[in-house]
Design a protein with these regions (language model features):
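Nucleotidyltransferase catalytic core that binds NTPs
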Residues: 1-284
């Protein structure tokens, strides 16, 4: 890889994306992982390292990358080692009041956990590659807009290839055995119990949940409204009959915690509707 890096620096410095691909020339991607990269110097003044991080995940060079509120790429091992971790997954397209309320209220609950020290806590906003490619090809401007907005909230942003939640937890567990929590809405939580997501695992959903909940993990559940306007929480959510007893095990063992101090008016906010309104306004101005 060192020889490839020297070659790329000399001959592909004006094409950073191609330079990245040349790093694996005649190398197997399974043999080595690049989990962070930073371009600096006069020749790379116009290169945004967040976009280069995105390329690492997109090209299968690593499973996840992280950058700090300043937009600088950071090593996951250094940032997460022996830390308490609160993670929020979303498309954040756009960031809505629901996202902010879920973040703020779940953080309040997390910091009240018995063994959580605020000074040793990391909050992660995670966007999966599938969320970035939901419209087809990745729109780099759209990605940068989301990244900058999330960075402005003062916490770490992660881009990952972890479609399933258990893979995210499994990844984070490499670096810490401290308290971890996932903040999510009821609808996302119900999807976690869909067995179709785990057909590639020999142990199926049991194996996935074993990986997800074996550590000090809790799920902070943000409520939603059903079609009749009823508020849905962990106490009245609907699951497939086969999953009910399975769910009760985690519920009664304190692994699922409701966020009660939420803003009821925010439950009528849906990011897709907001995005549609933004797009409609853009078309009017055009």
């Amino acid at each position: 890889m060192g020889a490839n890096l020297v070659y790329g620096a000399f001959y592909k410095h004006d094409e950073p994306k191609k330079l990245l691909k040349y790093l694996y020339d005649h190398l197997d991607k399974d043999a080595i992982e690049i989990d962070t990269i930073n371009f600096s110097g006069p020749l790379f003044e116009n290169v945004d390292n967040r976009l280069m991080s995105l390329q690492l995940v997109k090209n299968g060079m690593t499973e996840a990358v992280m950058f700090n509120p300043s937009g600088n790429n950071i090593l996951p091992a250094r940032e997460l080692y022996k830390k308490n971790i609160l993670a929020l997954r979303g498309s954040f397209r756009p960031v809505t009041k629901v996202n902010i309320d879920m973040f703020e209220k779940s953080l309040e609950v997390f910091l009240k956990e018995r063994e959580v020290n605020e000074n040793k806590t990391v909050v992660i906003f995670e966007i999966t590659l599938s969320n970035l490619t939901s419209q087809g090809e990745i729109d780099e401007k759209d990605f940068m807009d989301r990244a900058k907005l999330l960075c402005s909230l003062g916490h770490v942003v992660m881009i990952s290839n972890f479609k399933e939640y258990y893979r995210l937890v499994d990844y984070l567990s490499q670096y810490t055995k401290k308290q971890m929590a996932l903040a999510m809405g009821v609808n996302s939580f119900v999807e976690v119990f869909d067995e179709n997501y785990y057909t590639d695992l020999s142990g199926g959903i049991l194996e996935a949940f074993g990986k997800m909940f074996y550590n000090n993990l809790k799920v902070y559940l943000y409520p939603t409204k059903d079609a009749d306007g009823n508020i849905i929480t962990s106490n009245n959510l609907k699951l497939h009959p086969r999953m009910k007893d399975f769910y009760k095990f985690f519920k009664y063992n304190g692994k699922v915690v409701d966020i009660f101090d939420f803003e009821p008016k925010y439950l009528d906010i849906f990011s897709r509707k907001i995005l549609q309104q933004i797009n409609n306004l853009s078309l009017i101005h055009i």
